[in-house]
Curated annotation (Swiss-Prot):
The keyword Kinase applies. PANTHER family: NAD KINASE. Belongs to the NAD kinase family. This is NAD kinase. The active site is at residue 73. The gene is nadK.
């Protein structure tokens, strides 16, 4: 059994007053257990009359033993990026639809959550990707992603033309709607919708998936996660592109720009109930056939 948690940070889906009731339910449960509760400042805006200590996201990551995230996978992705340097474990209370990352239901607070707070849980680590942009002899860090980093066209439906390099070696040039570079965590997200494979979450790998490529020979490619992926916008490209991390607002790209994608130092810690089974989640969410007999 792991060490029980004592100081809990609570974070909710931003700018969504509908989750106030669920947040209150979780907060009341934690206080009833005699735990110290801190609340994220932005989340605190949903509780004008709250009496808990409101702290910045950074301070929450430094002072708390555990961060409980109330929302869906999108909320947990956002929190994972913002707390990536803290090393704090994350626990997701599922209010969204898919729930690949957040898997504790609000009605299971008295069972699953109580056991996890007492130290009965399973922990796994996921790596993140970092994106860097080289533009006009300048280099910029532009974002972090737990799921994927996507290069694509802005606003209009048109092909983008680019070249891809892996560890400095030319891979290919292509015309497509874009390219998704995904972690194992993100292999069940946009990359899957684009026709990519599902990667085991424990693999040290990432997958490159073309979005609607002009040439059908452009197939998904799984590579070592310690590789450096470079995407260079072709001189023949006529439409502005952009690069996005986990579906966040993108950074504009122009001819000659180079996007570098590589594994970010450090890992995200996720904790789950002891009965957590990733393959069971895949079967349920993707509607796979059950075992016969």
């Amino acid at each position: 059994m792991a060490k029980p948690f004592k100081i809990i940070g609570l974070i909710g889906k931003q700018k969504d007053p509908r989750i106030a009731e669920s947040l209150q339910q979780v907060a009341d449960f934690l206080v009833a257990k005699g735990l110290t509760l801190m609340i994220d400042q932005e989340t605190a805006a949903l509780f004008p009359s709250h009496h808990w200590e409101a702290v910045t996201r950074h301070e929450l990551g430094q002072r708390c033993d555990l961060a409980i995230v109330v929302g869906g996978d999108g909320t947990l992705l956002h929190v994972a990026r913002s707390l990536a340097d803290s090393g704090i474990p994350l626990l997701g209370i599922k209010l969204g639809r898919l729930g690949f990352l957040a898997d504790v239901l609000p009605e299971a607070l008295g069972t699953d959550l109580a056991a996890m707070l007492a130290g009965h849980y399973r922990e796994e680590e996921r790596f993140l990707l970092q994106a860097e942009l080289e533009q006009e002899s300048q280099s910029y860090l532009i974002g972090t992603a737990l799921n994927d980093i996507t290069t694509h066209i802005r606003e209009v439906v048109r092909l983008i033309e680019f070249e891809t390099y892996i560890n400095g070696r030319f891979l290919n040039s292509q015309r497509s709607d874009g390219l998704v570079v995904a972690t194992p965590t993100g292999s069940t997200a946009y990359a899957l919708s684009a026709g990519g494979p599902i990667l085991d979450v424990n693999l040290n790998a990432m997958v490159l998936v073309s979005i609607c490529p002009h040439a059908l020979s452009n197939r998904p490619l799984v590579i070592d996660a310690d590789s450096l992926v470079e995407i260079v916008i072709s001189e023949y490209n006529t439409t502005p592109g952009q690069v996005s991390c986990d579906g966040q607002p993108g950074i504009a790209l122009k001819v000659g720009d180079k996007v570098k994608i590589y594994k970010r130092p450090g890992r995200v810690r996720l904790i789950h109930p002891t009965a957590h089974d990733h393959y069971s989640i895949l079967r349920a969410k993707l509607h796979w056939g059950r075992k016969l007999g």
